[in-house]
A protein has these predicted regions:
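Short basic alpha-helical hairpin corresponding to helix-turn-helix/winged-helix-like nucleic-acid-binding
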Residues: 42-87
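A short acidic, leucine-rich amphipathic alpha-helix
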Residues: 21-26
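Alpha-helix C-capping/helix-to-loop hinge sites
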Residues: 11, 27, 78-81
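Short capping segments at the starts of secondary-structure elements
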Residues: 11-20, 31
Length: 87
């Protein structure tokens, strides 16, 4: 992945809510909206084709990592869906 895609991946992973494209653009002031959207597509494709348990989705006017639907029931049963934060 490109450096920008990795930066977006890290920010989205750390976020507790969906992040808008404008918020993601603020991570790299030199990157315009088109560049950020291309990097988001790169991250999304990486997670779509890599056999991961999470996926990058566009929801609520923003982007967020979510567990794949096929794991939702097991995660709900385990009752540990909230993960601890790292700074």
């Amino acid at each position: 992945m490109s450096p920008l895609a990795k930066l977006l991946e890290a920010a989205l992973f750390a976020a507790s809510r969906p992040l808008t494209v404008d918020e993601l653009c603020s991570l790299d002031p030199q990157a315009g909206e088109g560049t950020v959207r291309a990097a988001l597509a790169e991250v999304r494709e990486t997670y779509a084709t890599g056999g991961h348990g999470v996926e990058l989705v566009e929801i609520a006017q923003g982007w967020q990592f979510l567990s794949r639907r096929e794991y939702a029931e097991a995660i709900d049963r385990a009752q540990f869906a909230l993960r601890p934060r790292r700074s």
